[in-house]
Each structure stands twice: as structure tokens, then as C-alpha cells.
Amino acid sequence: MAYPMQLGFQDATSPIMEELLHFHDHTLMIVFLISSLVLYIISLMLTTKLTHTSTMDAQEVETIWTILPAIILILIALPSLRILYMMDEINNPSLTVKTMGHQWYWSYEYTDYEDLSFDSYMVPTSELKPGELRLLEVDNRVVLPMEMTIRMLVSSEDVLHSWAVPSLGLKTDAIPGRLNQTTLMSTRPGLYYGQCSEICGSNHSFMPIVLEMVPLKYFEKWSASML
């Protein structure tokens, strides 16, 4: 869930997003330590009166500042590569949904069903009900079962778009003529909001995404009512 004036990530709702949060904390700690060391050295250089005008080289120091950054980069790269491979894995998805980007709305098709598709437009501010979020509500939500692996196929009918839901750790480019895929799995029920994350024209800011994650039995009732 997002909060006003929030500086950090939204609460993780998927295993991938939880991994991304851990990686963010891990990397941020390394950056903080490096920044503290650099600021400390700069402050020493600005305040000390001692100089080493006769020092021409220092093999030990050069060896240390070559090996140490390499080790730090490895410590950052390994968990990053692990998460990248996890995001690409698609193991026996229970459901496949194809989403197409348009100027400026999304269309969805549940490919496992014979005729289950719809367009999803932003609800204008003048038509919002009490409690609904401005610029984030849609007329047709994407209803999906929770705790199940879902494959999303993402493409575009016109220009570049990007289908992104931050709390699920999702961001997939929608490219005309190309079909990208990603997986999602929500560990909790609820409404999860996203937006087009690639500038696609004058109404780019008005392409919200709303996922409604529900238990399987409620999803089955919804899908039956839509057919």
C-alpha cells in the first residue's frame, strides 16, 4: 500500500518484491558505508596540515583500492543476477492473461477462456465515488486469483507503453510487434494499483492499472459471470 509523502517502496505483496526489498536494503547499506568512508577521507584532507610530497607511489594502497571495489561489485552483482533469473522463470502458470497497451487505455484477454476480454479505462475525476483514488481507478479491474502463478503477456497496439505494478515488483515494456512475458503471484488479497511507466503521449498519465487479487473460489464466480 502507498502512503502520502512516502519515500520508500510500497509494501511487498509478492515473493519477487520481497527479494527486491532485501536487495535494496543490502545495496543501500553498501552505498552508505562507501559514502561515509569517502566523506571521512575528504574531511581529513581538508582539515589536516600534513602532506606527503615525497611519496611517488604506494603499491599496497593501489592493490587494496583495486581489489576491494571488485569484491564490493561482486557482492552487489550476485544477488542482483539471482533476482533477474527468478523474474524470468515461468513454471507451469495456472492462468495466462494478455494485456495490450493503447493510447490511452489497456485491454485484457484471459486466454484460458473462450471469450473473456475487456478494455480498462481510467474513471474520470467527475465520476469518482467517495473513497476512490483520483487518476488510479478504472472502469474494469483485472481480477486474478491470489497465491497462484499467473503469466502476463504484454504488448502494444500503437506506441511504447510499460505495464507496471510496484507492490508486486512488476514492470514490463509493451512494445508494438513484440510479445513480452512476466509472472506474478500475490500472497495477499486486495487492490493493487499501477500505471503506464513509459511516456506514450499526451495522456500518458491517465493509463492506470488496477489488479484485484481474490481467493480462487471468488475468481471462479467472477469469471463465470463474465462469460
UniProtKB/Swiss-Prot annotation:
Positions that bind Cu cation A1: 161, 196, 200, 207
Source superkingdom: Eukaryota
Mitochondrial matrix side: 46-59
Annotated Cu cation A2 binding sites: 196, 198, 200, 204
Enzyme class: translocase
Gene Ontology BP, a term: ATP synthesis coupled electron transport
Protein family per UniProt: Belongs to the cytochrome c oxidase subunit 2 family.
Function: Component of the cytochrome c oxidase, the last enzyme in the mitochondrial electron transport chain which drives oxidative phosphorylation. The respiratory chain contains 3 multisubunit complexes succinate dehydrogenase (complex II, CII), ubiquinol-cytochrome c oxidoreductase (cytochrome b-c1 complex, complex III, CIII) and cytochrome c oxidase (complex IV, CIV), that cooperate to transfer electrons derived from NADH and succinate to molecular oxygen, creating an electrochemical gradient over the inner membrane that drives transmembrane transport and the ATP synthase.
Protein name: Cytochrome c oxidase subunit 2
Species the sequence originates in: Syncerus caffer (African buffalo)
Lineage of source species: Eukaryota, Metazoa, Chordata, Craniata, Vertebrata
Gene (name only): MT-CO2
